[in-house]
Amino acid sequence: MKHEETYTSTLHTHVHFFIYEPQVIIRVKAVLFVQHDLNENASNYDHFANFMCDKGYVVVVSDMVGHGHSLIDFEQGYFGKTDVLDHLMKDMHHLQKVMMARYTDTPYYYIGTGLGAQMIREYAARFGDYFQGMLLMGAVSGVRAYRYKNLCLNFFKLMKGERYHLNKLALRNRMKLSHHFNGDYPFSYLTDNEQLVNRFSNDTLTNFSYTVKGYSDIYKISRHANSEETYQKTPTYLSTWI
């Protein structure tokens, strides 16, 4: 059974999330949190969540701020004015506490892809005692040419403002990924299924670009998630699959 709920983010917007609960089961195997990647939203994981739900898991899929319907001032690809990492971590922990109040004595796991995997890395360093394991897919090892990219973003911020959408950068990044798989379209890197590629291309909740501030936050999150400090703070007993 699927239902949608919201909570108030520390970034002062409403975060939407879906809960998938087995209808007929004696005991829930675990609660599984899904953290989506860039240019995604909670609805993209409906098929996977239903599959896991049928296997006896409770699945929680949440929009990240700036994605889906969890927007600040209706702005896609924008996380907020402040240094957002601490706020995003508090949001993740708040959602876990909501579920822990409902499912006590139940294992908790996280699964994430891309930026979602980086978020889980960071979360594990801060709240690793609160869950049993994590599965990280497509977690990049860092940010290449970070200083140069940050310099370019500061230039755009000065000239256009922090909410300016970098459409050309988004298109270039997607085409670069697609060319690795001999794809001809921006979303060809996702799958060779043309119907799914067209769906992503025509969906305004996935086919959007990030703001200058959004890209800056993404780079900072990825860099910090791969820092020595984060690795040292992550519990060694936490089950991790990469």
Residues of each region from the PLM?
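N-terminal cap/lid segment of alpha/beta-hydrolase-fold proteins
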Residues: M1-V24
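Serine-hydrolase catalytic core
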Residues: L177-I242
